[in-house]
Amino acid sequence: MIERIWSGRSRLYWLLLPLSWLYGFITFLIRQSYRLGWRKSWRAPVPVVVVGNLTAGGNGKTPVVIWLVEHLQRRGYRVGVVSRGYGGKAERYPLLLDDTVTTAQAGDEPVLIFQRTGAPVAVAPRRRDAVSALLAQHTLDVVITDDGLQHYALERDIELVVIDGMRRFGNGWWLPAGPMRERESRLTSVDAVIVNGGTPRTNEIGMTLTAGMAVNLLSGESRPLSQLHDVVAMAGIGHPPRFFATLREAGVSIAREIAFADHQSYQPEQLESLTQDATQPLLMTEKDAVKCKTFAQRNWWYLPVDAMLAEPRATQLLDKLESVIKRHTSNRT
């Protein structure tokens, strides 16, 4: 129902408009309070890059964070990542990730980023605390914050917005009548707009998600997707239909598609009941897999995806980030 409302296919959004006006007014006041100096932002001693979005729901933000980390690492830079840690609850914050930290503590996306990149990752409700914790333990050249475009308490040097190229901004209304956290006009003040799927517009950076081979959660074995048949596909992400579409485009034979809520926590018996028997493959997202590895079965697989940003804008973006890092380094010396 909410997808129909947000996409503009249902006129029920009229009932939610008063709440949306209130949401928009509050967010406007918050942003203005920082712009006018009524509230103070904290400046980190290293450059901060925010990767965020204007809408609720999955847009492909985490793959972009991973892409940035990996490409900056290849250029020789020491990169850290901070996050709010949605879906996790730690005994104390800030929480620095290591191999013993679980998704129940840190959330699924920070654990995924940590496992994929090996970069230092910290989570905290206040991103300032997470950045400070990282810098107390690691010498870093740049910090990337996963989400946090609207977290104005942390000053940023670069703002990147990721958009779902198929859904874009839905009906254009603020939450809850629509998907918007901020109005589309906010894009005029960011450094780059990355469009996941669809057709990018002028000055937008096109992006696609490229699927790898299926990986077995238990053994780590990799197989081409074409070798998995009669698959039960499951996804607990912001926009599950994107995952299912990726599988269909790859020619996967899907018996069932099961969508869970974003940041869903799973129980072993819950997932074991999804397949007919122990031979039918259960194929999930990598974000789901980080929550299921401790109780995985032999027939459970996940599909890693990588963000691919279109050239030449991808290289231009990295060059811009590098110039910011170098400028900060020269100012410190």
Curated annotation (Swiss-Prot):
GO terms for cellular component: plasma membrane. The keyword Transferase applies. Its EC number is 2.7.1.130. InterPro entries: LpxK (IPR003758), P-loop_NTPase (IPR027417). The keyword DNA damage does not apply. Pathway: Glycolipid biosynthesis; lipid IV(A) biosynthesis; lipid IV(A) from (3R)-3-hydroxytetradecanoyl-[acyl-carrier-protein] and UDP-N-acetyl-alpha-D-glucosamine: step 6/6. It is an enzyme of class 2 (transferase). ATP binds at residues 55-62. One of its GO terms (biological process) is lipid A biosynthetic process. One of its GO terms (molecular function) is tetraacyldisaccharide 4'-kinase activity. SUPFAM superfamilies: P-loop containing nucleoside triphosphate hydrolases. HAMAP family: LpxK. Belongs to the LpxK family. Transfers the gamma-phosphate of ATP to the 4'-position of a tetraacyldisaccharide 1-phosphate intermediate (termed DS-1-P) to form tetraacyldisaccharide 1,4'-bis-phosphate (lipid IVA). This is Tetraacyldisaccharide 4'-kinase. It comes from Pectobacterium carotovorum subsp. carotovorum (strain PC1). The lineage of its organism: Bacteria, Pseudomonadati, Pseudomonadota, Gammaproteobacteria, Enterobacterales.
